[in-house]
């Protein structure tokens, strides 16, 4: 198991220890740094709801480095991002693949970013089923419906047509950060924090 760093803050004569993720949360930063499953989704959703209760207007920053994961868990995060009142800014570092890419493009308009060497990948949902033929048919139908839902979400946030999304997600489709801008998955490639702060000040 990986060790979670602890940071110490000193205020006057008082010292307080935080794990690194709790300290980032104080600055309204959420890190999605793993595959998406129900446990991770519950943590992310809880953080979004907490930050909304702290300040319903102040921006939330979500950093994404994820290979994707369970669709239902990812959609729980997506729906919560859209539900909360504060705008959610997204930034990809490393990779945002599959459900990670969908969450990346679901950030507030004009506030979706990637670092220069990030990799974004979109594709159709996949799954394997076994059992009776009727059950397999039921699951296949549900997978097709899920794909339609994901395509609709991506079309909404990228401005691409449903037909284009359908074709482009047929197989694994990798993009550089610059290509993701052209496609509409993100709004800008950032090379330094100063560029982000200048944009926010404009």
Curated annotation (Swiss-Prot):
The keyword Manganese does not apply. GO terms for molecular function: ATP-dependent peptidase activity; ATPase binding; serine-type endopeptidase activity. It is found in: Cytoplasm. GO terms for biological process: protein quality control for misfolded or incompletely synthesized proteins. It catalyses: Hydrolysis of proteins to small peptides in the presence of ATP and magnesium. alpha-casein is the usual test substrate. In the absence of ATP, only oligopeptides shorter than five residues are hydrolyzed (such as succinyl-Leu-Tyr-|-NHMec, and Leu-Tyr-Leu-|-Tyr-Trp, in which cleavage of the -Tyr-|-Leu- and -Tyr-|-Trp bonds also occurs). Its main location: cytoplasm. The active site is at residues 98, 123. Its EC number is 3.4.21.92. Transmembrane segments: none annotated. Signal peptide: none annotated. InterPro entries: ClpP, ClpP/crotonase-like_dom_sf, ClpP/TepA, ClpP_His_AS, ClpP_Ser_AS. GO terms for cellular component: cytoplasm; endopeptidase Clp complex. Cleaves peptides in various proteins in a process that requires ATP hydrolysis. Has a chymotrypsin-like activity. Plays a major role in the degradation of misfolded proteins. This is ATP-dependent Clp protease proteolytic subunit.
